[in-house]
Protein backbone atom coordinates (compact mmCIF):
# COMPACT_ATOMS: atom_id res chain seq x y z
CA UNK A 1 0.00 0.00 0.00
CA UNK A 2 2.78 2.44 0.89
CA UNK A 3 4.75 1.47 -2.23
CA UNK A 4 1.83 2.45 -4.49
CA UNK A 5 1.11 5.79 -2.79
CA UNK A 6 2.69 8.63 -4.82
CA UNK A 7 3.50 10.61 -1.65
CA UNK A 8 5.10 7.73 0.22
CA UNK A 9 6.76 5.72 -2.57
CA UNK A 10 10.20 7.23 -1.79
CA UNK A 11 10.27 5.70 1.69
CA UNK A 12 12.29 2.54 2.42
CA UNK A 13 10.65 -0.89 2.76
CA UNK A 14 11.15 -1.06 6.56
CA UNK A 15 9.55 2.34 7.09
CA UNK A 16 8.77 3.61 10.58
CA UNK A 17 5.70 5.58 11.62
CA UNK A 18 7.96 8.54 12.32
CA UNK A 19 9.21 8.51 8.71
CA UNK A 20 5.67 8.33 7.32
CA UNK A 21 4.60 11.26 9.50
CA UNK A 22 7.66 13.25 8.43
CA UNK A 23 6.92 12.64 4.76
CA UNK A 24 3.30 13.72 5.20
CA UNK A 25 4.42 16.85 7.09
CA UNK A 26 6.78 17.65 4.19
CA UNK A 27 3.94 17.36 1.69
CA UNK A 28 1.76 19.71 3.74
CA UNK A 29 4.57 22.23 4.22
CA UNK A 30 4.79 21.64 7.97
CA UNK A 31 8.35 20.32 7.76
CA UNK A 32 11.50 20.95 5.76
CA UNK A 33 14.43 18.92 4.52
CA UNK A 34 17.87 20.03 5.63
CA UNK A 35 20.71 18.54 3.62
CA UNK A 36 23.47 17.62 6.08
CA UNK A 37 26.86 17.23 4.38
CA UNK A 38 29.38 14.98 6.06
CA UNK A 39 33.11 15.55 5.70
CA UNK A 40 33.40 12.52 3.38
CA UNK A 41 30.99 14.15 0.91
CA UNK A 42 27.92 12.10 1.82
CA UNK A 43 24.70 14.12 1.99
CA UNK A 44 22.02 13.13 4.49
CA UNK A 45 18.51 14.50 3.83
CA UNK A 46 17.18 15.14 7.35
CA UNK A 47 13.55 16.17 7.94
CA UNK A 48 12.68 18.62 10.73
CA UNK A 49 9.60 20.72 11.49
CA UNK A 50 9.49 24.28 10.14
CA UNK A 51 10.16 25.93 13.51
CA UNK A 52 12.89 23.47 14.55
CA UNK A 53 15.82 24.46 16.75
CA UNK A 54 19.46 23.47 16.34
CA UNK A 55 18.92 20.82 19.02
CA UNK A 56 15.98 19.38 17.02
CA UNK A 57 18.26 19.16 13.98
CA UNK A 58 20.96 17.37 16.00
CA UNK A 59 18.41 14.84 17.28
CA UNK A 60 17.07 14.33 13.74
CA UNK A 61 20.62 13.68 12.47
CA UNK A 62 21.15 11.11 15.23
CA UNK A 63 17.84 9.39 14.37
CA UNK A 64 18.65 9.36 10.64
CA UNK A 65 22.07 7.76 11.22
CA UNK A 66 20.64 5.25 13.70
CA UNK A 67 17.90 4.12 11.28
CA UNK A 68 20.37 3.86 8.40
CA UNK A 69 22.76 1.75 10.48
CA UNK A 70 19.93 -0.58 11.54
CA UNK A 71 18.85 -1.07 7.91
CA UNK A 72 22.37 -1.68 6.64
CA UNK A 73 23.15 -4.05 9.49
CA UNK A 74 25.91 -1.89 10.88
CA UNK A 75 25.71 -2.13 14.65
CA UNK A 76 28.47 0.27 15.50
CA UNK A 77 28.13 2.67 18.39
CA UNK A 78 28.50 6.39 17.78
CA UNK A 79 29.29 8.62 20.73
CA UNK A 80 27.10 11.60 19.91
CA UNK A 81 28.39 13.56 22.89
CA UNK A 82 31.86 13.23 21.32
CA UNK A 83 30.54 14.29 17.89
CA UNK A 84 28.86 17.44 19.23
CA UNK A 85 31.87 18.23 21.45
CA UNK A 86 34.27 17.91 18.49
CA UNK A 87 32.29 19.35 15.56
CA UNK A 88 30.11 22.38 14.84
CA UNK A 89 27.25 22.40 12.39
CA UNK A 90 27.63 25.31 9.97
CA UNK A 91 25.38 26.95 7.41
CA UNK A 92 26.71 29.49 4.91
CA UNK A 93 29.86 29.88 7.01
CA UNK A 94 27.95 30.58 10.24
CA UNK A 95 28.39 28.19 13.16
CA UNK A 96 25.16 26.88 14.70
CA UNK A 97 26.35 27.25 18.28
CA UNK A 98 23.12 27.90 20.20
CA UNK A 99 21.02 24.74 20.60
CA UNK A 100 17.86 26.68 21.50
CA UNK A 101 18.03 29.05 18.54
CA UNK A 102 15.64 28.31 15.68
CA UNK A 103 17.08 27.22 12.34
CA UNK A 104 14.99 29.98 10.75
CA UNK A 105 16.94 32.56 12.80
CA UNK A 106 20.15 31.26 11.21
CA UNK A 107 18.52 31.72 7.78
CA UNK A 108 18.09 27.99 7.15
CA UNK A 109 15.17 27.14 4.87
CA UNK A 110 13.90 24.04 3.05
CA UNK A 111 16.63 22.17 1.12
CA UNK A 112 19.45 24.31 2.55
CA UNK A 113 22.77 22.66 3.28
CA UNK A 114 24.37 22.33 6.69
CA UNK A 115 27.82 20.82 7.14
CA UNK A 116 30.13 19.62 9.88
CA UNK A 117 33.26 21.58 10.71
CA UNK A 118 35.85 20.60 13.29
CA UNK A 119 35.95 22.83 16.36
CA UNK A 120 39.18 24.62 17.08
CA UNK A 121 40.72 23.84 20.45
CA UNK A 122 40.49 26.70 22.90
CA UNK A 123 43.46 27.30 25.17
From Swiss-Prot:
It comes from the Eukaryota. InterPro entries: SNRNP25, SNRNP25_ubiquitin, Ubiquitin-like_domsf. It is found in: Nucleus. Residues 32-123 form the Ubiquitin-like domain. SUPFAM superfamilies: Ubiquitin-like. The keyword Nucleotidyltransferase does not apply. One of its GO terms (cellular component) is U12-type spliceosomal complex. Its main location: nucleus. GO terms for biological process: mRNA splicing, via spliceosome. Keywords: mRNA processing, mRNA splicing, Nucleus, Spliceosome. Disulfide bonds: none annotated. CDD domains: Ubl_SNRNP25 (cd17058). Component of the U11/U12 snRNPs that are part of the U12-type spliceosome. This is U11/U12 small nuclear ribonucleoprotein 25 kDa protein. The lineage of its organism: Eukaryota, Metazoa, Chordata, Craniata, Vertebrata. The gene is SNRNP25.
Amino acid sequence: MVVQDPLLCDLPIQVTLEEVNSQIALEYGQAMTVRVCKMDGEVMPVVVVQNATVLDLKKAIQRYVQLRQEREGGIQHISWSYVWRTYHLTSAGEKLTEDRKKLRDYGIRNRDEVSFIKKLRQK
